[in-house]
């Protein structure tokens, strides 16, 4: 009889422990995890700069040629790219190789693009300095384009400072922007992508990173500051 009692006790104990483990495993993630001052203060070792600091660093220097990438640098152009994907290749990125998409994007769809405030501030600063403004984009070239007109209007660029957009295109294994930065003698180049920064460095120009908005359709988001370059604060919008 005692053996039976002990066996039953052991079985009950095992059942209780098993239920506790199951309950713990199925418990929901806490809704409020909390934080600490140390976590809140944690920052990546990035060389942050402001537009005012960039302007100050150029003080005393003669007017020069400066360049900007377009998409996610001065324009939040995801609406046009999103429409292009849905229209031409909903299940893939093949629309980026479709000339029909680029005809649409370069001839009107930037009317849906939102000018970034950092773009306004930077361009206004360089116009005030008397710099020559170039836009060098990885977009494919089309027979006609209204991007130059859109950018000039959106950012109030005087004709004396404005140059037509350079469509460098995209070629596998090649940074297509490098030759244009060299050819136009661009001294400062702003961009959101890694290849913008490396293109600038390849020609001895100052590459400055603009943050890509977290809701951009262009994924994955790049790691700003990964090359030790300057990164503009609050430049995601």
From Swiss-Prot:
Which reaction does this enzyme catalyse, per its entry?
a phosphate monoester + H2O = an alcohol + phosphate
The subcellular localization recorded is: Periplasm
What are the record keywords, sorted? Answer: Hydrolase, Magnesium, Metal-binding, Periplasm, Signal
What does the record give as EC number?
Answer: 3.1.3.2
Key word Signal present in the record? yes
Query: By its UniProt entry, which Pfam families does this protein fall under?
Result: Acid_phosphat_B
Q: Which residues bind Mg(2+)?
A: 69, 71, 192
Where do the catalytic residues lie? 69 (nucleophile), 71 (proton donor)
Question: Domain of life of the organism in this record?
Answer: Bacteria
Give me the comment on cofactor binding. Binds 1 Mg(2+) ion per subunit.
Q: Which GO terms describe its molecular function?
A: acid phosphatase activity; metal ion binding
Cofactor(s) named in the record: Mg(2+)
InterPro entries reported for this sequence: Acid_phosphat_B-like, HAD-like_sf, HAD-SF_ppase_IIIB_AphA, HAD_sf
What residue stretch is flagged as signal peptide? Answer: 1-25
Q: Binding positions for substrate?
A: 137-138, 177
Family matches, as CDD domains: HAD_CBAP
Q: Name one GO cellular component term.
A: outer membrane-bounded periplasmic space
Primary location? periplasm
According to the record's subunit comment, the protein's assembly and interactions are: Homotetramer.
Similarity section:
Belongs to the class B bacterial acid phosphatase family.
- Function of the protein: Dephosphorylates several organic phosphate monoesters. Also has a phosphotransferase activity catalyzing the transfer of low-energy phosphate groups from organic phosphate monoesters to free hydroxyl groups of various organic compounds.
Put simply, this protein is called Class B acid phosphatase
| Annotated organism of origin | Enterobacter sp. (strain 638)
Q: What is the lineage of its organism?
A: Bacteria, Pseudomonadati, Pseudomonadota, Gammaproteobacteria, Enterobacterales
């Amino acid at each position: 009889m005692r053996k039976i009692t002990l066996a039953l006790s052991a079985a009950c104990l095992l059942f209780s422990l098993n239920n506790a483990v199951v309950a713990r495993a199925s418990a929901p993630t806490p809704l409020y995890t909390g934080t600490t001052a140390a976590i809140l203060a944690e920052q990546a070792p990035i060389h942050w700069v402001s537009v005012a600091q960039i302007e100050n660093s150029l003080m005393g220097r003669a007017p020069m040629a400066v360049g900007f990438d377009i998409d996610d640098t001065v324009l939040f152009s995801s609406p046009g790219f999103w429409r292009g994907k849905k229209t031409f290749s909903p299940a893939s990125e093949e629309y980026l190789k479709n000339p029909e998409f680029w005809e649409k994007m370069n001839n009107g769809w930037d009317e849906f693009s939102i000018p970034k405030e950092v773009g306004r501030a930077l361009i206004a600063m360089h116009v005030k300095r008397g710099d020559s403004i170039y836009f060098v984009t990885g977009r494919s070239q089309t027979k006609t384009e209204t991007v130059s007109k859109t950018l000039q209007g959106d950012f109030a660029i005087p004709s004396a400072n404005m140059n037509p957009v350079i469509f460098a295109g995209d070629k596998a294994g090649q940074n297509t922007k490098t030759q244009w930065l060299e050819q136009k003698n661009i001294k400062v180049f702003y961009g959101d992508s890694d290849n913008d920064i490396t293109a600038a460095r390849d020609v001895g120009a100052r590459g400055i990173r603009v943050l890509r908005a977290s809701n951009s359709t262009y994924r994955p988001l790049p790691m700003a500051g990964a090359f030790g370059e300057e990164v503009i604060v609050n430049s995601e919008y």
